[in-house]
């Protein structure tokens, strides 16, 4: 009997020793509270990972990545957003990334952050997602991303750089993916021109910028729901229109001919514009920065509740670097671009000089504009 006991003890020891470190961590994560995970895989930017595993965990759970605003933290977004409570109701896991930078804005300006597997914050967040899928046997068709302000900017970037990971996204008061691009490759840089709504282009240009963040990708892309307030003085309301243009361009929708516009939806003074099953814009009249999180509407958009769109996304055409003239400006008869017009960028064959009084300003490597 003693020999049998020793054998059982040895077998148990070997079984525990053979388990991967990640599996060990997953077993130790306490459900029902915010927990930090430190060994989720490659973390090139030093982004912190926090996770909420509900007590009511589904057998094959979904995942919601909830990304905080500037000055925020994972703890602050966990406390100030409804996703943990909704996780208990619907059984999904919430990942709360935390920015590694002073001021805790996200890097949506460097080339590394704006490139699939480029080594920036987006890369680290993607690795959090794949770790969670592996450790919890998550449903890969129910992985979603959302964020507010700087987190909304990163949400757009995640949808552009890692479209294969996400089924849908909600964006609360952000800017288009690539709008904050730094020509000097500044990490976590601020772009006042973009923030103030002065970077204006066409759906084709914006869509091309998003597609170029994952060159060669032709698979499904996440459905996008864009919220913005009409009196936002941090990220000006023009960014709502530019973000909607971007995703209309990605999905091939006619931005100027939406399928429908619904007043007082999802509440009074909110207007919902639907371009197709993959894109909705929600403009909140009288609301500043940021639009409050609409948790139950998010659950419907993500497909956790009835009446939502299917989480099946639509494949898109291969990325292209071709660009077109900005809708905010045009070329004059003398061959120079007017105010707001495009004047440069990869593949640009139009005018490279601006009308008198304006300067051709590099917005990103794909787009320069007369400002």
From Swiss-Prot:
It holds the Pfam family Esterase_PHB. Residues 307-335 have a biased composition (Low complexity). Residues 335-371 form the CBM1 domain. It is found in: Secreted. Gene3D superfamilies: alpha/beta hydrolase (3.40.50.1820). It is an enzyme of class 3 (hydrolase). One of its GO terms (molecular function) is acetylxylan esterase activity. Residues 305-335 are annotated as: Disordered. Residues 1-19 form the signal peptide. Residues 305-336 are annotated as: Ser/Thr-rich linker. One of its GO terms (cellular component) is extracellular region. SMART domains: fCBD. Glycans are attached at residue 191. Keywords: Carbohydrate metabolism, Cellulose degradation, Glycoprotein, Hydrolase, Polysaccharide degradation, Secreted, Serine esterase, Signal. Monomer. NCBIfam families: esterase_phb. Acetylxylan esterase involved in the hydrolysis of xylan, a major structural heterogeneous polysaccharide found in plant biomass representing the second most abundant polysaccharide in the biosphere, after cellulose. Degrades acetylated xylans by cleaving acetyl side groups from the hetero-xylan backbone. Has a modular structure: a carbohydrate esterase catalytic module at the N-terminus, a linker rich in serines and threonines, and a C-terminal carbohydrate-binding module (CBM). The genes for catalytic modules and CBMs seem to have evolved separately and have been linked by gene fusion. This is Probable acetylxylan esterase A. The gene is axeA.
């Amino acid at each position: 009997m003693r020999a049998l006991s020793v054998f059982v003890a040895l077998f148990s020891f070997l079984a525990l020793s053979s388990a991967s470190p990640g599996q060990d961590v997953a077993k130790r994560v306490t459900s029902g509270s915010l927990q930090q995970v430190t060994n989720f895989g490659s973390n090139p930017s030093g982004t912190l990972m926090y996770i909420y595993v509900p007590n009511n965990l589904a057998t094959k759970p979904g995942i919601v990545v909830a990304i905080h605003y500037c000055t925020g933290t994972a703890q602050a977004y966990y406390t100030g957003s409804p996703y943990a409570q909704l996780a208990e109701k619907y059984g999904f896991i919430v990942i709360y990334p935390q920015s590694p930078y002073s001021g805790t804005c996200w890097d949506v300006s460097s080339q590394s952050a704006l490139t699939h597997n480029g080594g920036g914050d987006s890369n680290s967040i993607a690795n959090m997602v794949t770790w969670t899928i592996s450790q919890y046997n998550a449903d890969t068709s129910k992985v979603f991303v959302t964020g507010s302000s700087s987190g909304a900017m990163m949400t757009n970037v995640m949808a552009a750089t890692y479209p294969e990971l996400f089924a849908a996204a909600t964006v609360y008061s952000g800017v288009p993916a690539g709008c904050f691009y730094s020509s000097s490759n500044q990490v976590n840089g601020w772009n006042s021109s973009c923030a103030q709504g002065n970077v204006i282009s066409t759906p084709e240009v914006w869509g091309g910028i998003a597609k170029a963040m994952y060159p060669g990708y032709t698979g499904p892309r996440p459905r996008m729901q864009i919220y913005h307030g009409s009196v936002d003085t941090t990220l000006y309301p023009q960014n709502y229109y530019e973000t909607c243009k971007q995703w209309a361009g990605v999905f091939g929708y006619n931005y100027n001919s939406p399928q429908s516009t619904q007043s007082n939806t999802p509440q009074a003074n909110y207007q919902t514009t639907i371009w197709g099953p993959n894109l909705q814009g929600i403009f909140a009249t009288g609301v500043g920065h940021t639009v409050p999180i609409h948790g139950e509407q998010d659950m419907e958009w993500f497909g956790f509740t009835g009446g939502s769109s299917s989480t099946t996304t639509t494949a898109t055409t291969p990325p292209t670097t071709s660009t077109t003239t900005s809708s905010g400006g045009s070329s004059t008869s003398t061959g120079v671009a007017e105010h707001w017009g495009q004047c440069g960028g990869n593949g640009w064959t139009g005018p490279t000089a601006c009308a008198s009084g304006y300067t051709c300003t590099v917005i990103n490597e794909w787009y320069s504009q007369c400002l």
